[in-house]
Amino acid sequence: MTAQPNPIINQEFLFALLREAAPSGYERRAADVWKKEAATFARVSEDHYGNVYAELGPEDGPAVALLGHLDEIGLMVSHVGDEGFLSVLAIGGWDPQVLVGQRVRLLAPDGDILGVVGKKAIHVMEPEERKNASRIEDLWIDVGLSKEEAQARIPVGTYGVIEQGPLMVGDKIVSRALDNRVGAFVVLEALRLLQGAELKHRVVAVGTSQEEIGSYGAQVGSYRLQPVAGVAVDVTHETGQPGVSEKKYGVVPFGSGANLAVGPMTSPVILRQMITAAQASGIPYTLSANPRLTHTDADTMILSRSGVPSAVVSIPNRYMHSPNEMVDVRDVKACIDLLAAWGRALEVGTDFTR
């Protein structure tokens, strides 16, 4: 049975983003979908590093940046073995256990090729082997080709992603790459809500590249825009699932709304503004302590040029960096609404001094 479209969010656009393969360094496919949607209501541009931009408001106004990274964790072919089996390296932070038995889409030069992640079956393992966790170097991709065919069609350096599309499970969205295609979706949908508003700033939504390997796209984009303030939208760990500590991550269950980071890397001024906007509009939110880095695009935006006052808004996410991540539609909508409310209220000349 086909799931019905969700009326709370633009599900068609989000699912279109999620269907595209866009590992770090190969974001083009998702960027094209994002840019096409943005062009229906905003001024759009891009840079040589894979970032895409959409903006509203006065073109000569001070910039405010809303960042959501388009890239996902992936794989890269490093070797073609004698029997045509492919060795791969990780792009980003994989738990190799979740790769075993998965279907993979390889983004080969002459067209995508599907394969499966192979591992020695438990029946032929020695007893000691069964106790060991899988390592990525112990896995391979089987594409059903000979060595000669594989070498001809799949050169070293070919990118790959898990082959897993989006679906609705109740009011939850399940897909690979929700980290952080959903953040890129949120920043553009928030910008959409600002159409017709008398904006005092040039509000720029950015679909950034290469967050999963170091937030390099955010560094390039922030340097280009020179924003007076910025927000990174990403995912955080949902704490209603087994084994995720509320003592460490805060109380962040599904349905709790937008999660706001509190810590030395983020701007206390923007945090207060966000809380005020949320309370005024009845938008649910939670707080999480981040005493060091935020591990988002904010970490490089904050240090761009002479520094950018920044905040982090996160969507609670289960099963992060797996083929089937999960988010709640209500939390996605809360993040969209909060960014838009903050953007409308932001005054030119705000003093962001701590």
Give the predicted meaning of each segment:
Residues 1-354:
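N-terminal hydrophobic/helix-forming segments and targeting peptides
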